[in-house]
């Protein structure tokens, strides 16, 4: 029986695939136990931490404290009318040992939003493939974890990861909803209204999460609206686009945004355009590496199957280069915004979401290219497919080898000097084995105990040593001098000073 119509075979493959990726990701999950708060984690969570210290898990007071934090930063620092609220709930307000929950807070939305996108696309093209969305979501999540350019800012540091990844994840889901609404004439009325309403909610939340994710969401929806309006006279994505633009404007025009941008020397418009173009081009060169080729190879067979769907006309595949062009424009726009407003390309956490956009864009381009070969150029790929079927016993080993390659080599080539690091799984295993993760956690736990000592209203702490700074867990540390992290109000001290004891 053909694999795509053999439910039992698909179930076996999915189970084995999930087991293998779970084993490969085990060091990443274990390493989260040693993650600890730093930098803005303390500043944003000062109010909620005070509530926990005084009242325990008092939900109404916690919600009020988080809302007050949100309002304060909206008016005084940045117009993120959603993320300030979520950042106030960094897990360490309940104690350092809970901070590892950051990884779960990041990965669950990412996985399920990728699943939502895959489900909207796959079940529209081939309703029989009910397990394929789970496999695609798991594969992309695995690839994102292993190749993330700045994993500490995307997986283990709460303030950095939660200020970007959840809103990027919602943008991914919104793209899936927009795709489903492209076929609104084939959807039940209730489902059309549900998808449109969900798109509006997602768009408004994204707008209050981060400006870059908000801009990406607007551009993706704008593309969907333009394509559907021209070719299908379909306007079901317009409400989500309106909500996205309203949310982004509410963010950009906030008083806090004006305060933040006034503190940076933004680049001129032409300079920002050119610099963003050059950086986007350089990223394409740097990120086209072996792990990415392994990912694209793993996607070939499922994407080839989907290109044969009768739901899509041949016209869709006429210009496969448009996939790469749209991907480049999206990357350029995401880099342009911080370049123009703040004069720089942004931190590693921004490059994380640019990289994930790049990966998904290449997957879409691969889909268009395969469809172009078969349905436009008339190149039959059935021979290659038959060869793969004859090698059915070897395919699991080949797929496992590619996953192992992705878990070892990684894609950490965004910034100069990072080429020596492994992929996230292997690097996590290395840091667990050499004890640097344990030393990092022990040092910060000792610091927390000192800061929680009520008998010491004035506290002096030391920076971390070099052997207490594992690459995957360490983002930054205090520097000798006054407290710049907000440790004083967070721990309720009269003063906190930092001394270099070495």
Question: Each predicted region: which residue ranges?
Answer:
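Intrinsically disordered, polar/acidic, low-complexity terminal segments
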Residues: 2-77, 92-134, 377-502
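Membrane-interface micro-motifs in multi-pass membrane enzymes
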Residues: 130-182, 210, 333-367
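Short hydrophobic alpha-helices at membrane interfaces in multi-pass membrane enzymes
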Residues: 180-204, 235, 239
